[in-house]
Amino acid sequence: MNTSLFIAKRLYAKENNNNYTRPIIRIAISAIALSVAIMILSVFVLSGFKSDISNKVFGFGGHINISKFSFNQSYENDPINYNTELSSEIESMDFVNYIQAYATKAGIIKNNNEILGVVLKGVDQNYNWSFFYENLISGDTPSFNDSVAKNSILISQNISKKMKLNVGDDMLIYFMEQPTRVRKFIVSGIYKTGLSEFDDITAIGDLKHIQKLNNWDINQIGGYEISVANFKNIEKYTSLIDESIDYDLKALSIKHKYPQIFDWLRLQDFNVLIILI
């Protein structure tokens, strides 16, 4: 065979082969790039979802909780004395954003023929409302002072819809004491976080009401909520705070107070692994 003819045929065949495979290679590269982009986007979406849920839980309960050392798991707190020195000491720690007093008490809302179990969270005039400001959909957050108990109360949209309550409406909460005790509140605002575990039951009112209902002194509270700067170090911070409080108190991280939520969030990491694999 003529050498020139042989070389020409080989070059022609190679060119035809390149023309045939080039679109396939381009499609394959595009598919790989799209897959990688989807994986990266999925990881970011899942990470954002976990962060959003965590921040909402922090908004309801802080990062670290200080309460009476007991085995009480109910919404009826064992009282502790508010300690100004302890509060100042903890707030001076470089990783602490703020510390605030609270107490909780279970009750039943009754409106016409509707009833609903709720948890009244009592807070004082120093409470940080920033989380609820961000999630407020109607009205305003309550304003309390250090002298007279206020009847203003903040409820969720879920409670508002179930009980047909709006801003400015009167609301009765019954507390199962002996005998049953009732308190009248006025709805000052309505919030919505989308976290039904809390939205379904949580109302925010004046700490003084819980103190009176429980026959506590004015200096007695249910506990402290603490916000810290870096959640990743929460276990370390919890240990440091636990070492600084009296033996009859305990410091508990929010991860251990609501383990079911954070265990579920941790399971979402497996979804990331599945996506990456």
Protein language model regions, located:
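Peri-transmembrane interface segments
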Residues: N16-R26, N230, I234-I277
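Helix N-cap motif at beta-to-alpha junctions
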Residues: P79-I80, T84, D206, N230-N233
